[in-house]
C-alpha cells in the first residue's frame, strides 16, 4: 500500500537512567483529543519507576485523524504500534536515551489489550525484528472480537453504544468488505455517523449520549440484527479473522492477563477463551470481581506498577521475606 505518516508520544523519566522501554497499545478512544499524542495517558504513571513509554496513535488518530480508524483490525493496528517502536528507538538511543536493558515490556488495556497480544504475535511470528520481550501485560481485551460483538446482538444491550458503529465501520472499512453499512445501521445512526464518529470531535461518552440508547436494536437495522443475513455473516467472517484467538499461535514470552468478571464492555468470556486456547503458555491470569471495565482499568495500571516493582526487586536480589 501507500506509505503513511503516523504519530504518537514518548514519555521519558525526568531524571536518572532508563530501565526499559514499555511499548503501550492504547485503549478505545473516539475523539482525536484523546489520542496519546494529545493527552497524558494513564499508563504514563509508570514513567516514575524509571521506564520510558512509547505510545503510538493508531491510524485514524493524531496526524491521521482524517482517516477512518480500522477498529480492531488486529494485524494493521499491531503494525502501527510496532512501526512506531522501530522508528523511535534508534532516535532515542542516538539522543542518549538508551535503556539499561535491551528487552522490552508490552502493555495494553481494552482495545489495547487485544492489540498488545497482536504485537506480541507479530514480533514472535516474524522473528527477524530481533526484539526481546520481557513480559506482556494485557487487560480487559477483546481477544475474540466476534464473541464480543455477538454479546451486543444476543442480549440486545450495550453499555458502550458507540462501540457498535465504531466496530462495524472499522471491520467493513479496514477489511475492505463489500457490505453496505446503510443497510445494517438504523437510519438515524447511519445519517449521523460522519458527524458523531468520523469527525473525531466527540469522546466515547459524548457519542453514547448522542446515540441516546443502550438497546442494540435501536442502533442496528433488522438486517444488522440478523446473524443469518449476508451482511452480518461477512462481518462475522472479518471479526473471526481479526480475533487473536483464531491465530495458530501460542504466546512465547511471559504474559500477565487481567480481566474483571464484572466487565460491562468487554465480556469476561474473552479471558476464559484465552485461557482455554493458550493452555501451556507462560501466562499468569488475574481474574476476579474488579468492577466494571473502567474501574478495572485503574486497578490494572496499579497492578502492573506493583508487578514491575516486584520484578525489579528480584532483578536486584532485594527480596522481601
Predicted regions and their residues:
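Short beta-strand/loop motif that positions the catalytic acidic residue
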Residues: 251, 256-263
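N-terminal cap/lid segment of alpha/beta-hydrolase-fold proteins
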Residues: 1-20
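Gly/Ala-rich beta-loop-alpha elbow adjacent to hydrolase catalytic centers
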Residues: 108-112, 116, 263
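C-terminal catalytic histidine-bearing segment of alpha/beta-hydrolase fold enzymes
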Residues: 231, 235-242, 265, 269-321
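Acidic catalytic loop of the alpha/beta-hydrolase fold
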Residues: 145, 261-266
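Accessory cap/linker subdomain of secreted extracellular hydrolases
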Residues: 139-248
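Alpha/beta-hydrolase active-site loop
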Residues: 71-94, 120
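Short substrate-entry loop that stabilizes the transition state in hydrolases
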Residues: 15-19, 24-54, 59-65, 265
Amino acid at each position: 500500500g501507500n506509505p503513511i505518516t503516523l504519530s504518537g508520544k514518548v514519555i521519558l523519566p525526568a531524571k536518572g537512567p532508563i530501565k526499559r522501554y514499555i511499548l503501550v497499545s492504547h485503549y478505545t478512544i473516539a475523539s482525536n483529543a484523546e489520542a496519546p499524542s494529545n493527552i497524558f495517558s494513564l499508563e504514563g504513571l509508570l514513567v516514575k519507576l524509571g521506564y520510558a513509554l512509547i505510545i503510538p496513535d493508531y491510524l485514524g488518530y493524531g496526524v491521521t485523524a482524517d482517516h477512518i480508524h480500522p477498529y480492531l483490525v488486529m494485524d494493521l493496528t499491531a503494525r502501527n504500534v510496532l512501526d512506531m517502536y522501530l522508528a523511535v528507538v534508534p532516535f532515542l538511543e542516538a539522543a542518549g536515551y538508551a535503556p539499561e536493558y535491551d528487552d522490552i515490556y508490552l502493555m495494553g488495556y481494552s482495545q489495547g489489550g487485544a492489540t498488545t497480544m497482536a504485537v506480541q504475535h507479530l514480533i514472535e511470528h516474524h522473528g527477524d525484528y530481533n526484539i526481546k520481550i520481557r513480559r506482556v501485560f494485557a487487560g480487559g481485551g477483546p481477544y475474540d472480537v466476534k464473541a464480543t460483538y455477538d454479546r451486543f446482538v444476543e442480549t440486545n444491550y450495550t453499555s458502550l453504544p458507540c462501540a457498535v458503529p465504531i466496530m462495524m465501520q472499522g471491520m467493513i472499512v479496514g477489511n475492505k468488505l463489500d457490505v453496505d453499512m446503510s443497510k445494517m445501521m438504523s437510519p438515524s445512526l447511519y445519517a449521523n455517523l460522519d458527524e458523531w464518529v468520523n469527525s473525531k470531535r466527540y469522546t466515547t461518552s459524548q457519542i453514547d449520549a448522542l446515540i441516546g440508547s443502550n438497546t442494540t436494536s435501536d442502533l442496528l437495522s433488522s438486517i444488522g440484527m440478523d446473524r443469518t443475513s449476508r451482511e452480518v455473516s461477512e462481518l462475522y467472517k472479518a471479526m473471526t479473522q481479526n480475533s487473536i484467538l483464531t491465530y495458530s499461535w501460542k504466546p512465547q514470552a511471559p504474559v500477565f492477563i487481567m480481566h474483571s468478571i464484572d466487565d460491562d464492555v468487554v465480556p469476561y468470556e474473552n479471558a476464559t477463551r484465552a485461557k482455554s486456547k493458550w493452555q501451556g503458555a507462560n501466562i499468569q491470569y488475574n481474574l476476579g470481581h474488579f468492577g466494571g471495565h473502567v474501574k478495572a482499568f485503574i486497578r490494572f495500571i496499579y497492578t502492573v506498577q506493583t508487578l514491575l516493582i516486584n520484578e525489579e526487586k528480584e532483578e536486584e536480589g532485594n527480596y522481601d521475606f
